């Protein structure tokens, strides 16, 4: 795909405590490489990737294929950058909420991140995937899978255990989030009867949408 040759521009935001592996996770997803020497993100950074999203009919048959330009925003986890980070929440259509499986504290702080999301995201119930990263460090693990799945069930969101080092579930977790977003947008399109192809500059927003309201469902 050339520049501008896409149907949707989707902005995803990775957030979580500093050091949970957001930067290496996104690098693995976009470049399929692992770089353990990334320095801590200062403020905001982002990576990009073009994908093709295939829809399915009600009977399970193949539907239309959409070309999607993903912008994956990488946020600083440190407290001093928190006000800058939350300023980007309203522009994101989906969130990769990440904690470190080798850090119980980063898992406990997921609740704080959820509170900030609910207060600052484009709506009160945005599309979120919970990610327990560094699954390859088995001997250092502090958070068990049951704990994490129970928390994800409480919030009604998918949960994945990932590893930027091995690539485990990295692509699958992002694809799951994209699927949630595209299905939500499809419902909006059906209700408002707007064209099914949205120019990238609109970021997938539907004509007539009221930005001031924080209702997610159309």
From Swiss-Prot:
Instruction: Output the Gene Ontology cellular-component terms.
Output: apical plasma membrane; axon cytoplasm; exocytic vesicle; Golgi apparatus; Golgi stack; late endosome; melanosome; multivesicular body membrane
Its membrane topology is listed as: Lipid-anchor
A Pfam family (short name) is Ras
Binding positions (GTP): 16-24, 74-78, 133-136, 163-165
Question: Could you tell me which residues are lipidated, with the kind given as S-geranylgeranyl cysteine?
Answer: 216, 218
Q: Where in the cell is it found?
A: Membrane; Late endosome
Q: How does it assemble?
A: Interacts with SYTL2, SYTL4, MYRIP and MLPH. Interacts with RPH3A and RPH3A. Interacts (GDP-bound form preferentially) with DENND10.
Q: Which purpose does this protein serve, as stated in its record?
A: Small GTPase which cycles between active GTP-bound and inactive GDP-bound states. In its active state, binds to a variety of effector proteins to regulate homeostasis of late endocytic pathway, including endosomal positioning, maturation and secretion. Plays a role in NTRK2/TRKB axonal anterograde transport by facilitating the association of NTRK2/TRKB with KLC1. May be involved in targeting uroplakins to urothelial apical membranes.
> Which protein family is named in the record?
Belongs to the small GTPase superfamily. Rab family.
Protein's recorded name: Ras-related protein Rab-27B
Q: Which organism is it from?
A: Rattus norvegicus
Q: What is the lineage of its organism?
A: Eukaryota, Metazoa, Chordata, Craniata, Vertebrata
